[in-house]
């Protein structure tokens, strides 16, 4: 196959060798046959849900780090929660706004570096993002 695709698949494979990657092989084959328009549709859809979520988070008052490529938008909670405790913020968030976030500190070797950051997923359908946006606005209206 094309050298760039083989290299990419081989690189991914080296990080998957600790699990059985059998199910990924047919999925990869199908994906390689999909038209570019499929991936363009994914890009456009993810950009729209990202922008909607990031706009709402910004309007609420978070410092938002809008990603160029990801499924997650990271925010600094300190403008909203001066304690900067992302873990506790994420524990309270479902009761406050009916949505969840993940504290970024769990991804750090030195958790205190990410303590004030949390991430929200935007890899959802737009109606789900809209419902979450409404819930966040309502939850932080006070």
PLM feature spans:
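PLP-dependent class I/II
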Residues: 1-142
